[in-house]
Amino acid sequence: MRSGTLRDVSSPGAALASGVSAGFVSGVLIAGVGGRLAMLLLRVTSDPALRGFLTDDGFTIGRVSVETLFLLGVTAGLGMAGGIFYLVVRRWIPARWRIPLMTLFFALVGGAGVIRPSEVDFTLLAPLPLAVALFIAIPAAYGAMMTWMAERLLREDSILRRRSWAWIVGLAPLAFANIVGIAVLLVAFGVWALGRSAPGLVAAWRSQVATRFGRAALIVMAVTSGAGLVRDGLDILG
């Protein structure tokens, strides 16, 4: 890649690296480590006979094993996906509301995705209110931390912009995603190239109409997920 091209992609590359890095770190720490700590707490508060019991996700309650490392890999991948998603929707959200709204959004969407009345985590573990609260709090905390980190990494004086190559290091977590990470880079490069060749598309994407549609889509996702979360939560708590 020529130096001119490298300079051209450094700004969008740093933006992508911000979402990837923030999502990776938040996914591993909050969803991965935090999720295991939540399960440890629930093991302590639940029937001791559940130790060694397999959950619906294939993980062993109360035991650190190879499955735990796999879980960290999964949460890292999901975290990066969430960080990239945030980059897409970020401009639709007023700056001062980004952290609280993303915290709420991920609490609803993430909670609805995790909490299922038929799963072991929400039938055998006790107390059930604590289990429900923990698995809503974890995606909420992820949303808060990821957004906070991404906003700081997106600043002009962030560590990803202090050197011309720093953003490349910020994209390194994509290596954990193997072929998916390569696909993300190819799609991102394609979007960047399309934006350079068709500035009208960029203007349309940044228009008020697109912003309204984007906000409406986020609201629909949050409301739909929230309704499902309330329904499943009430079903679990009986």
Task: Kindly label every feature range from the protein language model.
Residues 2-238:
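Juxtamembrane/disordered regions of integral membrane proteins
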